[in-house]
UniProtKB/Swiss-Prot annotation:
Residues annotated for acetyl-CoA binding in this entry: A373, N379, Y380, S398, S416, R433
Enzyme Commission no: 2.7.7.23, 2.3.1.157
Family to which this protein belongs: In the N-terminal section; belongs to the N-acetylglucosamine-1-phosphate uridyltransferase family. In the C-terminal section; belongs to the transferase hexapeptide repeat family.
Organism of this sequence: Caulobacter vibrioides (strain NA1000 / CB15N)
SUPFAM superfamilies hit by this protein: Nucleotide-diphospho-sugar transferases, Trimeric LpxA-like enzymes
Organism classification: Bacteria, Pseudomonadati, Pseudomonadota, Alphaproteobacteria, Caulobacterales
Name assigned to this protein: Bifunctional protein GlmU
Gene assigned in the entry: glmU
Length: 462
């Protein structure tokens, strides 16, 4: 879910840095296109920028990952990306966005596409600072282990004097636990004027964005720091860090849902998606997985080991255990979808039931209808999908196959084991199975013959 903050006082823009190689991920997928809660890291960063009210968003990408640029342009439009080539540091990356923002007059925030937990509310204090007291504002955090981070050298009142990178730090500076998240905000003109004067005379030969702080201080421009929890500014550079960020995100979202009145007996076992909507009064049992696009109404119960994606669950509905709702499933109020039932692109009416071992794909189930165990909506002929519609109050006998396109009318019934290939009119009973015959004594004779054959084989072996 995109978290928003109050309306901006001045126009805002964001420069999202997404040009890193991401080699430590050891994956053919670009780092920022890996997913957290079902959404790419890049999209999480864009969500934060949009939540801040940024009217312009520029994503800085590397020439090595065209997929990243394609993803950004697909969401933001054809002019949303610039290329940093060659990669010469964070300051150089932000400078790559200068021309794209030449006609923008307002405040700019620099963020990172690999920091999915750095949301709009986390960043928002920087805009408050540059609106009221600062020319440049930096987001900092207090690190339990500061090794590897740039250190914030502060004066009283969170006045920021300079940022010292780890490789440039002396022993005393390395003892400082106030660290730089990398997120920085300033007026556009101030930011790019300072960047134009950044030099690369450092251990890595790169142009550091952090050097703008020292330059600002030299020019008697005010610089300030806002602090955020360490967990909210952690970057993702390896698979283990992605898993750690996922765990933090899931924990935060589960807590928020429980505060809103959702019951979770074992919250640590529930996996949510970025846009999962669950109303207060709903119950989510153990080991439930939500993919993107799920909405659950108040009073619904999602029982253990169910999997939902792209589905709507109405008030008082009962799902599972071991149910699967796929995209397009709409479960009406007080409907039941039971164990080992799969529903895809089917609207299930209020009070309808499919309690056991069924596949319902493409179509509808009317109010109060009952779907017997083992029912299959046969929706695919190998080339096309077709729809099955079960009317209000209809009763589908166990082990029925409904071969689409077909309609079972209101109040109609099908006999168990039937293969229904033609429409069934309202109130009718449809049967399609061979007549049962009974041969008296046949089973007894069969067993006797088989036992004799078995005994004869034993005698030969003896």
């Amino acid at each position: 879910m995109t978290e928003s903050v109050s309306k901006p006082v001045r126009p805002r823009a964001a420069v999202i840095l997404a040009a890193g190689q991401g080699t430590r991920m050891k994956s053919p997928t670009p780092k920022v296109l890996h997913r957290l809660a079902g959404r790419t890291l890049l999209d999480h960063a864009i969500d934060a920028a949009e939540g801040l009210g940024c009217e312009r968003i520029i994503v800085v990408v590397g020439a090595h990952s065209p997929q990243v640029g394609e993803s950004a342009r697909k969401r933001l439009g054809p002019d949303a990306t610039v290329i940093q080539d060659p990669p010469l540091g964070t300051g150089h990356a932000v400078l790559a966005a200068k021309d794209a923002l030449a006609d923008f007059h307002g405040d700019v925030v620099v963020t990172y596409a690999d920091c999915p937990l750095t949301t709009a509310p986390v960043i928002a204090p920087l805009f408050d600072l540059i609106t009221h007291v600062a020319h440049v504002a930096v987001l900092g955090f207090e690190a339990q282990n500061p090794t590897g981070y740039g250190r914030l050298i502060l004066a009283p009142g969170h006045v920021l004097l300079r940022i010292v990178e780890e490789k440039e730090a002396d022993l005393a500076t390395k003892q400082v636990k106030h660290c730089n998240s990398g997120v920085l905000a300033a007026d556009r003109a101030v930011l790019f004027d300072l960047l134009a004067n950044v030099r690369n005379d450092n251990a890595k030969g790169e142009y550091y964005l952090t050097d703008v702080v020292g330059l600002a201080h030299e020019r008697h421009l005010s610089t300030r720091t806002a602090f955020a929890p360490e967990a909210s500014v952690q970057g993702v550079n390896a698979q283990a860090e992605l898993a750690a960020a996922e765990a933090v995100w899931q924990q935060n979202r589960r807590k928020a849902l429980m505060v809103d009145g959702v019951t979770m007996p074992a919250p640590d076992t529930v996996h949510l998606a970025w846009d999962t909507q669950i109303a207060g009064g709903a119950v989510v049992e153990q080991f439930v997985v939500f993919g993107p696009g799920v909405s659950v109404a108040s009073g619904a119960v999602i029982k253990a080991f169910s999997h939902l994606e792209g589905a709507v669950v109405g008030e008082g509905a009962l799902i599972g255990p071991y149910a699967r709702l796929r995209p397009g499933a709409e479960i009406g109020p007080d409907a039941h979808i039971g164990n080992f039932v799969e529903v895809k692109k089917v609207k299930v009416g209020a009070g309808a039931k499919a309690n056991h071992l069924s596949y319902l794909g493409d179509g509808s189930v009317g109010e109060k209808a009952n779907i017997g165990a083992g029912t299959i909506f046969c929706n695919y002929d190998g080339f096309e999908k077709f729809e099955t519609h079960v009317g209000k109050g209809a009763f589908i006998g166990s082990n029925s196959a409904l071969v689409a396109p077909v309609r079972v009318g209101d109040g109609a019934m099908t006999g168990s084991g039937s293969v229904i290939t033609k429409d069934v009119e309202d109130g009718a009973l449809a049967l399609s199975r061979a007549d049962q015959t009974s041969k008296a004594g046949w089973a007894t004779k069969f067993r006797a013959i088989k036992q004799a054959q078995k005994d004869k084989k034993k005698d030969k072996k003896a």
